[in-house]
Swiss-Prot record:
Protein's name in the database: DDRGK domain-containing protein 1
Cytoplasmic side: 24-289
Membrane topology term: Single-pass membrane protein
Domain of life, per lineage: Eukaryota
Subcellular location: Endoplasmic reticulum membrane
Family: Belongs to the DDRGK1 family.
Comp. bias intervals (Basic and acidic residues): 87-166
Broad class of the protein's primary localization: endoplasmic reticulum
Extent of Acidic residues compositional bias: 70-85
Subunit: Interacts with Atg9; the interaction is transient.
Lumenal domain ranges by topology: 1-2
Record's keyword terms, sorted: Endoplasmic reticulum, Membrane, Transmembrane, Transmembrane helix, Ubl conjugation pathway
Region of interest (Disordered), ranges: 65-168
Length: 289
């Protein structure tokens, strides 16, 4: 082989080897440059810088742990906070507070406000019901007192009526009695005959003016009234004395007709009874054959 060609080949191989070696050296230098360089000492040396770094790292770790603890807070603590007396106080939300914690505290506060509003409404309703109950009791007590007074008044009026009737009966009895000695059978018969005439006259007339009745039997008007009252009490005479000074005799059959009329109608007013009285009661004098 030609020596010149051989020399050229060897030269090329050498160049290639040198190029590869140069490239490897170039790659090693950047890696060495990327390694941390020694910190230049400033104002107190490396010890102070490292202390600052450690303090910051501890602060970040504490903040992370605090945030995790707040997010994992148990529901029991929430219920305890709801029962606390100062929960309704104004809460100052910190700008550094987490969004989840802020939302929980806001929800807790709203829940407490709603609970207080419901409690307030219940208290108002309870107070109103108590007032209504007291008012109802007052009304019932007033009605019971009025009923008691009414019953006492009715009882008193009934007692006075009975007492008055008894007094009238005694007066009537005394009017028909004969006083003194010398009482005999003929005088008793005359008295009974006079009483029968008195009753018969009223029954036949049906409606008699008390003054005319007294004049007919030569009695005082009050004496005639007393006799009628006594006969009514004994059941020998039935009727009513109206406000015009007349006595209206009502027979037993007419009383039964009135009772039957009232029973058929159920409830009858005085006006209706007065309107139908002409059909139920015969007011015309009875002709004695």
């Amino acid at each position: 082989m030609d020596p010149f060609i051989l020399a050229a080949i060897i030269s090329g191989i050498v160049i290639i080897i040198l190029s590869i070696a140069f490239l490897r050296v170039s790659q090693v230098k950047p890696q060495a440059a990327a390694r941390p360089r020694a910190v230049v000492q400033r104002d107190g040396g490396p010890g102070r810088v490292q202390a600052v770094r450690n303090q910051r790292a501890r602060m970040r770790a504490n903040a992370a742990r605090h945030q995790a603890a707040l997010e994992e807070e148990p529901e029991i603590q929430e219920e305890a906070d709801e029962g606390a007396p100062d929960i309704d106080q104004k809460i100052d939300f910190d700008d550094k507070m987490g969004a989840k914690k802020r939302a929980k505290m806001e929800a807790k506060l709203e829940k407490k406000k709603a609970h207080e509003a419901e409690e307030h409404l219940r208290e108002i309703k309870k107070k109103k019901e108590e007032e209504q109950e007291q008012e109802r009791k007052k009304i019932e007590e007033k009605q019971e007192e009025e009923e008691r007074k009414r019953e006492e008044a009715e009882k008193k009026a009934e007692d006075e009526r009975k007492k008055r009737e008894q007094e009238e009966y005694e007066a009537m009895k005394a009017a028909f009695s004969i006083e003194g000695e010398g009482f005999d059978e003929n005088e008793e018969e005359d008295r009974e005959s006079l009483l029968r005439d008195f009753i018969g006259y009223i029954k036949t007339q049906k409606v008699v003016l008390l003054e005319d009745l007294a004049a007919h039997f030569k009695l005082k008007t009050q004496a005639a009234i007393d006799r009628i009252t006594e006969l009514q009490a004994s059941g020998e005479l039935t009727g009513v004395i109206d406000d015009r000074g007349k006595f209206i005799y009502i027979s037993q059959s007419e009383l039964e007709s009135i009772a039957k009329f009232i029973k058929q109608r159920g409830r009858v007013s005085i006006a209706e009874l007065a309107e139908c009285s002409n059909d139920l009661i015969n007011l015309a004098p009875v002709t004695v054959p």
